[in-house]
A protein has these predicted regions:
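Short S/T/G/P-rich N-terminal loop/turn motif that feeds into the first structured element of a domain
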Residues: 1-27, 39, 43, 54, ...
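Helix N-cap motif at beta-to-alpha junctions
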Residues: 49-55
């Protein structure tokens, strides 16, 4: 499955909500969180997601009212 990284503001999400998202099963758009990296001091959140396509990532965020600053398809060395 393709992998994506995106960035957006952390607020209004809480650390508890991030943990729930990290452990959540695949959503209705086919998206799962591989990792969530954040900085509370800079109010910045980076999501590493597995998703069928960029549109699924957009819908995943739109559902909770978040618009990412960017979404990029990425590869890993693993």
């Amino acid at each position: 499955m393709p992998k994506f990284i995106d960035a957006h503001k952390m607020n209004p999400l809480t650390k508890q909500q991030l943990k729930q998202a990290q452990n959540a099963p695949k959503d209705e758009f086919g998206v799962t969180h591989e990792n969530i990296i954040y900085s509370e001091t800079e109010n910045k959140l980076f999501c590493v997601l597995n998703a069928p396509n960029k549109e699924a990532v957009e819908k995943h965020h739109r559902k909770i009212g978040i618009k990412p600053d960017y979404i990029h398809e990425v590869k890993t060395t693993k």
